[in-house]
Amino acid sequence: SQDTFSDRLTIFLTHFAFFLKVYKTEENKKILQEIYDFNFRQMELSIREIGYGDQSINKKMKDYINVFHAILSDIHFWDTMNNEDKINKLSKFFNNYEKIDHLIEYFNDFNNILSKKTLNSFLKSVSNS
């Protein structure tokens, strides 16, 4: 199947959803909001670079934000879901993905890696100070 901007964005949004799921605490609220805002600003710039006009950009951004929040909602209980539930959840966003079980395994690993690190371990290398 064809690799598209939309597919790549869905992959990114899924990673970002896991990132927010793992690190969302009251203590991290402000910095995570800044990261969220930054990511969606960058997405909008990328969509503009592809050549979408202002009206279609607003619709595209709304669509992508809705997809992101749907992913975030669907993975909320990832840690307690069985494999079949995980497949059902991710299949909604990756319906053309042939090896969904590999994707589930990958995101299980990604989730575990994130949960073993602190948010600060990711922020050290990107801070402005």
Regions inferred by a protein language model and the residue ranges of each:
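Surface/interface-facing alpha-helical segments and adjacent flexible terminal/loop regions used
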Residues: 1-129
